[in-house]
Amino acid sequence: MSSFLMGYPHAPHHVQSPMSMGNGLDPKFPPLADDYHHYNGHYSMTASTGHMSGAVGGGAGVGSVGGGGAGGMTGHPHSMHPADMVSDYMAHHHNPHSHSHSHTHSLPHHHSNSAISGHHQASAGGYSSNYANATPPSHPHSHPHAHPHQSLGYYVHHAPEFISAGAVHSDPTNGYGPAANVPNTSNGGGGGGSGAVLGGGAVGGSANGYYGGYGGGYGTANGSVGSTHSQGHSPHSQMMDLPLQCSSTEPPTNTALGLQELGLKLEKRIEEAVPAGQQLQELGMRLRCDDMGSENDDMSEEDRLMLDRSPDELGSNDNDDDLGDSDSDEDLMAETTDGERIIYPWMKKIHVAGVANGSYQPGMEPKRQRTAYTRHQILELEKEFHYNRYLTRRRRIEIAHTLVLSERQIKIWFQNRRMKWKKDNKLPNTKNVRKKTVDANGNPTPVAKKPTKRAASKKQQQAQQQQQSQQQQTQQTPVMNECIRSDSLESIGDVSSSLGNPPYIPAAPETTSSYPGSQQHLSNNNNNGSGNNNNNNNNNNSNLNNNNNNNQMGHTNLHGHLQQQQSDLMTNLQLHIKQDYDLTAL
């Protein structure tokens, strides 16, 4: 039945084609019948699968395949059976025929399952009870396989497809041979046995046990259900599907270490599961054992999810589900028993300063808080802005990672910083002004205004300088007038020195040297006022008075020269004052 459920026609007991791993092996039952045609390989597969013929028909034999298909095979002569077997295979297989599945199901054949799962291999023996149940030696297939272990066979062979084939088979066997079922049931754990096949056997076991439990209920059909139940198994069957099929093809599960580990896992699973009537739940199957009629449609969402898990996940998480912290629950965002969704850290957005944690319902987030940058972040951003006012995307990503900020925050900070920079430098806001102030030529007018503003500021500075220089000149005029009245170049030199312009002291004599008349007057003044000069060398006023008194000679030429010199001196003073102002202004 399960074979049908499995989607295998009866004929294809061995729908092991997937199991063809065994193809290399000489088919136990050369598929003479069409049913076996693919199953040839499969059959042999079964040998390798072991669990095909062994598990189901010779479940043990096959099982042993895992451990040693041949042994299992021998278990049922089937293994040895030639093609004729194949043709009869159904009968044989199903027949008590040497199968008599007595074949030593007791042997690890059950391994058949184990073979499939590759779990039990050695432990099969240990499990044999389970497997046996599963495969149940008890059924000593005498059931007569006629009934057809076919179905068994199917299971067995198909089972491979479903991995727990062995287990399933055992169920089928059970189905056929309630006795077998009983064992499975006993596997309550029986399922455990069959389960052994599956998930590390345990799951499968439970499945079988489960079915066994059911199984007894289902009877033959149940058996098929069991296999079918590869749903139960299905985690096994589907999940383990490949691995089981691949007892040969998947070296990883077939390695000695892999088999030993699987065996250990199975032992643990069975030990833990057998005592509990609800192995399936403990194993993470969570099938409802109370539903005698539950078939594939009866699986809950979580059960379906469980089917998708890999054997390794099953092995590691079977016992964790009740705790609610199994990987599968996390990965599948399973709900807790309260129906509340668990929010794991990986489901949350990475925390970034100023960004919501994702703990609010969409649309209900509070107003975004103003992002508070740390001093370190601001320092780094200012450094970068100092060198580049505009960031490339690559550089922006680098800064975002180093400062633990989002790219968007970096981008906005730089936009704001550029606006601040333009404001500080009194530059036009190109972002908003560009659209309004574009000339017919497309040139932004603000750019044209820049020089005008600077020029205006320069003009203002020059005007201020001129005003200040004029004020200074007005203050200097009385002294200069005295110089003019004195008609003395010497006094001009004194005035210039009094104004703090030593550079111009030599200028007076140098300029006067070009004028012979002025030279004469200097000598005259010195001669005439020699007495006064000797007495009052440091008295400028006395000098001026003497000069005024002594120089009433009315030399117009000299007076003209003095005026010219005065104008030159004034221009020099103005320039000098401007230079000083420029320095102070800066």
Curated annotation (Swiss-Prot):
The UniProt keywords, alphabetically, are: Developmental protein, DNA-binding, Homeobox, Nucleus, Transcription, Transcription regulation
Q: Does the keyword Magnesium apply?
A: no
Q: Which ranges are annotated Polar residues under compositional bias?
A: 126-135, 227-237, 245-255, 510-521
Any Pfam family matching the protein: Homeodomain
DNA-binding region(s) in UniProt: 366-425
Motif, Antp-type hexapeptide: chain positions: 343-348
State where composition is biased (Basic residues).
92-112
What is one process in the GO biological process aspect for this record?
A: head development
One Gene Ontology CC term in the entry: nucleus
Molecular-function GO terms, alphabetical: DNA binding; DNA-binding transcription factor activity, RNA polymerase II-specific; DNA-binding transcription factor binding; molecular adaptor activity; RNA polymerase II cis-regulatory region sequence-specific DNA binding; RNA polymerase II transcription regulatory region sequence-specific DNA binding; sequence-specific DNA binding
Q: What is this protein called?
A: Homeotic protein deformed
Which species expresses this protein natively? Answer: Drosophila melanogaster (Fruit fly)
Q: Which gene encodes it?
A: Dfd
